């Protein structure tokens, strides 16, 4: 009876192991970069001026869309107060929730990032 129990236990363990192995090889996940106050630069991360220069070079090399300067809103153009006041629409836009996305420093300095992640900051 003990040998039957031992055989079933071994068979169960092999089945669990193979299932986990297949799950790991089949599952394709996306990497999620996380940072905390204790994060330190990755040995192969891009930091400081190196990061800035790389983004500048990639953006100038691989993006074709030129940035168009925002036209001033008609009510802001001629008003002397336009330098210190903004429209209601713009003011309310600051109250909306920002997209929760790691910063470029978190993604590319404290972690190692891809060219596609760098291009997202163009």
From Swiss-Prot:
A UniProt-annotated Pfam family: Insulin
Keyword field contains Signal: yes
Positions of the propeptide removed during maturation: 71-87, 91-96
Tissue specificity: Expressed in the cerebral light-green cells which are giant neuroendocrines cells involved in the control of growth.
Statement: the UniProt record of this protein carries the keyword Disulfide bond: yes
Record's signal peptide: 1-29
Molecular-function GO terms, alphabetical: hormone activity
Cysteine pairings via disulfide bonds: 47-109, 59-122, 108-113
Principal place of residence: cytoplasm
UniProt keywords, alphabetically: Cleavage on pair of basic residues, Cytoplasmic vesicle, Disulfide bond, Signal
Family from the record: Belongs to the insulin family.
Subunit-level organization: Heterodimer of a B chain and an A chain; disulfide-linked (doubly).
Protein name, per record: Molluscan insulin-related peptide 3
Source organism of this protein record: Lymnaea stagnalis
Upper lineage: Eukaryota, Metazoa, Spiralia, Lophotrochozoa, Mollusca
């Amino acid at each position: 009876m003990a040998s039957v129990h031992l055989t079933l236990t071994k068979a169960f363990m092999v089945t669990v192991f193979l299932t986990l192995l297949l799950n790991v090889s089949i599952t394709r996940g996306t990497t999620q970069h996380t940072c905390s106050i204790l994060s330190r630069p990755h040995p192969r991360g891009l930091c400081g001026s190196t990061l800035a220069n790389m983004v500048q070079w990639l953006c100038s090399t691989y993006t074709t869309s030129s940035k168009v300067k925002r036209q001033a809103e008609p009510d802001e153009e001629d008003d002397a107060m336009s330098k210190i006041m903004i429209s209601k629409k713009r003011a309310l836009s600051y109250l909306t929730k920002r997209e929760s996305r790691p910063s470029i420093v978190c993604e590319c300095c404290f972690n190692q990032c891809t060219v596609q992640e760098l291009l997202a900051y163009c």
